A protein has these predicted regions:
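Rossmann-fold cofactor-recognition segment
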Residues: 49-63
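Short amphipathic alpha-helical/adjacent loop interface patches that line ligand
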Residues: 96
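Short, functionally important structural connectors and interaction interfaces within domains
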Residues: 53, 189-192, 222, 286, ...
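A hydrophobic C-terminal alpha-helical subdomain
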Residues: 218, 254-315
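Oxidoreductase cofactor-interface core, primarily capturing Rossmann-like NAD(P)-dependent enzymes
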Residues: 2-47, 62-72, 79-93, 101-112, ...
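Universal eukaryotic N-terminal targeting presequences
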Residues: 1-2, 314
């Protein structure tokens, strides 16, 4: 058997990178091996990956030299950033620059960069339908990623631009799950009206990324993934069915959502408005059938709920 191609995974202890690492490790005959980047090889998450067969390497996306060392001898690399750790487009741009330069220096043959749209292509700063944030962005956590695509192109790194969707896991971890109103009734609240919102299970993002690495014909291309395109009402109905409690869908205006006051509420309010205002463009870029071709295990929203129903906080 030929030697396995090494895929270096940033964010290996997080949702996207962890899903990719587990997908590769679950396919011992797939021809790929995992080198997981971690800042702490003694963390429980790092040890869990090592137990599955991952090679651990200590590196940091803020340290370009450490990335060059981590990428040495690898075939491919999965690059992802976590905007919500710092809320800084400038920091994100610096991290992506480090990744792109390190990938070029290491001779990476296939990079998969987890990105999103630069919404300013649709909503220029002069468009007042939504507020401009941090002086020069509409949806900072989208725009910073989309703007950074050029780092890989300019560096000459063979890259697939991998556009993700709304994580359904946000209903578990990000405080978006059903909340009780004054009368005790449960509801999810989103500023989406009756528009469809492409979404996906976080674990499926990693599985789809694995599918991309098996498709060198996707180098130089932009791809988008989703498990389903449900409306808010459809998600509430699925929750009611699977969780066994009546759950309503409350649609609010983007202005109301932006006013909720939690960290990032303005960014997310603008994001949901972008989803709704450009429903056709955003959805068309995220084909469920294409996603399933990358990942035959792709879950629908109801299937994901069924697996995770005990993890969704209520109230």
């Amino acid at each position: 058997m030929s030697e396995k191609k090494i895929i270096v995974v940033t964010g290996a202890t997080g949702a996207q990178g962890g899903g990719l690492a587990r997908a590769i490790l679950a396919d011992p005959n797939g021809g790929f091996a995992v080198r997981a980047i971690t800042r702490d090889p003694n963390s429980d998450a790092s040890k869990a990956l090592a137990a599955l067969g991952a090679e651990l390497v200590v590196a940091d996306v803020d340290d370009e030299a450490s990335l060059v060392r981590a990428l040495d001898g690898a075939y491919g690399a999965f690059f992802v950033t976590f905007f919500w750790a710092h809320f800084s487009p400038a920091k994100e741009a610096a991290q992506v620059g480090n990744m792109a330069r390190a990938a070029k220096a290491a001779g990476i043959k296939h990079a998969v960069w987890s990105t999103l749209e630069d919404t300013r292509r649709w909503v220029p700063l002069s468009d007042n339908r939504m507020p401009t944030l941090q002086e020069k962005f509409k949806v900072p956590h989208f725009d910073a990623k989309g703007e950074s695509n050029a780092r890989f192109t300019e560096a000459g790194v063979p890259t697939t631009f991998f556009h993700t969707s709304f994580y359904w896991d946000n209903f578990i971890h990000f405080g978006m799950g059903p909340k009780a109103g004054p009368d005790g009734s449960l509801a999810i609240t989103l500023p989406m009206g009756d528009k469809k919102m492409p979404g996906i299970a976080a674990e499926d993002i990693g599985r789809c990324a694995y599918g991309v690495f098996k498709r060198p014909d996707l180098i130089g291309q932009s791809v988008g993934i989703a498990g389903e395109h449900p409306t808010g009402a459809e998600m509430a109905a699925a929750m009611s069915k699977v969780l066994g409690k009546p759950i309503a869908y409350h649609s609010v205006s983007p202005e109301t959502y932006r006013s909720f006051g939690f960290p990032g509420a303005d960014d997310l309010g603008n994001m949901f408005q972008f989803y709704a205002d450009f429903e056709e463009d955003f959805g068309k870029a995220r084909s469920v059938s294409f996603s399933r071709s990358l990942n035959p295990q792709l879950q629908s929203f109801e299937a994901w709920l069924t697996v995770n129903k005990d993890r969704i906080p209520l109230g």
